[in-house]
C-alpha cells in the first residue's frame, strides 16, 4: 500500500513509498517515549504539545508532488480515524462487534481514564478523496461518530507516528477481520455524491451557526473588504468571479457544487453573507467565508503560501479569512 511519509508536519514535500502491511504495522507497534511527563505535557500550550508529538507522520495514500494540501491528494489506501472521545473497553468492542481489519494505537494525549486512539481501517482498493469522505464517515457512524474528532475525515489529514510521554501508557492492537470493500460502503448511500447525506456528529450540526454568530457582519467591515461585500452578495460574487470553481447544484437548490470534486451540494450559503464548503478537496474546505474571502482565496490564495510565516496579512494585501473550523 502507498504511504506518504514526512519527517515533520512542517515538511513541504512528503515521500511516497510502497510499504507492505507487515512493515507498516511493525512501525506502529513501537512508540517513541519523550522526555516530559504526562502531567507536564497536559499543562503545556498547544504549540509546545504539537512540537513534542511531531515525531514525523504519514498520509496513507498518494500525494501530487508530495504536497500535503487538500487539492493534492490523489488517492487514499486506508481509512484513518482519530478517536478523541474514546471510552474504556473500546478496543474490546471493536474486536467483538466489527469484522474489519484494523490497527489501533494510542495518541500522545491518551490516558487509561480518557482513551484517545487512532484507528486505521484497511480497504480492498484505493479510494478517491471524495470517496474517502463518504466511506470514512459511514464507518465512523457504524462505530459511533460522536467518538471521533470532527476534522478526522479530511483526506489530507496527517497522522503522527506513535509517541508517548515518559510515564505514559502506549496501547497497540491489531484487530483481525476482512478488508473493507469501499463499494459496499458507498452502496449504503442513496447517492454517496450528495454530501448533505453524509453522517455528521451532533457537534458539527451546530458549529457553523455558532461560528456565524461570532463573526463580524461582513457588510460592516471597513475599507475595500466592506465595500466589496456591500456590492456583491456571496452568490453574486461566486457567479461573477469564480464560476469555474463553484456551480449551482442540481442536487439541492440553493447550494453549490465544487466543480473539480466528484461529490455534490457541499457548498452551503448562509443568508447570502457567508459560504461554507464541505468538499474535502476544496482548498477552502472548513472555512466560513464572506464574499470577499471566497473570491480572494480561490483567486489569490497562493499568496498565503508564498508569504513568510508570521507575515501580517495587511502586508500581502489580503484580508484575514474568517476562522477555520473543524468540519469536513
Predicted regions and their residues:
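N-terminal single-stranded DNA-binding subdomain of primase/primase-helicase replication proteins
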Residues: 73, 240-301
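Single conserved hydrophobic/aromatic residue that forms the stacking wall/gate
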Residues: 316-327
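Acidic, glycine-rich loop-and-strand cores that form catalytic or ligand-binding grooves
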Residues: 219-246
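Long, charge-rich alpha-helical interaction segments
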Residues: 177-228
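Signature for HUH/AEP ssDNA processing cores
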Residues: 1-115, 122-134, 138, 202, ...
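Short, conserved secondary-structure transition motifs
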Residues: 112, 122-127, 148-175
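Hydrophobic/aromatic-rich, well-ordered segments within soluble, folded domains that form packed cores
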Residues: 108-128, 132, 181, 185-199, ...
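Short secondary-structure junctions
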Residues: 99-102, 147-149, 238-251
Amino acid at each position: 500500500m502507498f504511504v506518504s511519509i514526512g519527517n515533520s508536519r512542517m515538511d513541504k514535500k512528503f515521500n511516497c513509498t510502497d510499504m507492505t502491511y507487515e512493515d507498516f504495522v511493525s512501525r506502529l507497534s513501537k512508540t517513541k517515549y519523550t522526555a516530559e511527563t504526562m502531567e507536564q505535557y497536559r499543562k503545556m500550550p498547544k504549540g509546545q504539545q504539537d512540537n513534542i508529538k511531531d515525531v514525523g507522520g504519514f498520509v496513507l495514500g498518494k500525494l501530487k508532488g508530495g504536497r500535503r494540501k487538500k487539492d493534492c491528494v490523489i488517492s487514499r489506501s486506508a481509512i484513518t480515524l482519530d478517536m478523541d472521545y474514546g471510552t474504556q473497553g473500546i478496543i474490546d468492542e471493536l474486536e467483538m462487534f466489527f469484522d474489519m481489519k484494523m490497527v489501533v494505537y494510542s495518541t500522545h494525549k491518551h490516558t487509561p481514564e480518557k482513551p484517545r486512539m487512532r484507528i486505521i481501517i484497511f480497504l480492498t482498493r484505493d479510494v478517491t478523496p471524495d470517496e474517502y469522505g463518504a466511506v470514512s464517515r459511514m464507518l465512523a457512524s457504524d462505530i459511533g461518530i460522536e467518538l471521533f474528532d470532527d476534522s478526522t475525515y479530511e483526506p489530507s489529514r496527517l497522522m503522527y507516528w506513535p509517541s508517548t510521554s515518559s510515564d505514559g501508557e502506549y496501547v497497540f492492537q491489531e484487530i483481525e477481520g476482512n478488508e473493507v470493500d469501499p463499494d459496499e460502503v458507498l452502496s449504503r448511500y442513496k447517492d454517496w455524491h450528495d454530501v448533505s447525506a453524509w453522517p455528521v456528529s451532533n457537534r458539527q450540526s451546530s458549529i457553523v451557526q455558532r461560528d456565524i454568530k461570532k463573526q463580524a457582519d461582513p457588510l460592516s467591515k471597513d475599507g475595500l473588504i466592506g465595500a466589496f461585500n456591500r456590492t456583491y452578495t456571496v452568490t453574486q460574487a461566486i457567479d461573477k468571479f469564480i464560476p469555474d470553481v463553484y456551480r449551482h447544484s442540481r442536487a439541492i437548490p440553493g447550494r453549490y457544487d465544487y466543480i473539480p470534486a466528484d461529490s455534490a451540494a457541499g457548498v452551503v450559503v448562509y443568508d447570502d453573507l457567508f459560504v461554507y464548503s464541505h468538499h474535502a478537496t476544496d482548498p477552502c474546505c472548513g472555512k466560513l467565508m464572506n464574499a470577499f474571502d471566497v473570491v480572494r482565496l480561490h483567486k489569490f490564495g497562493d499568496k498565503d503560501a508564498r508569504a513568510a510565516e508570521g507575515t501580517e496579512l495587511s502586508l500581502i494585501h489580503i484580508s484575514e479569512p474568517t476562522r477555520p473550523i473543524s468540519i469536513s
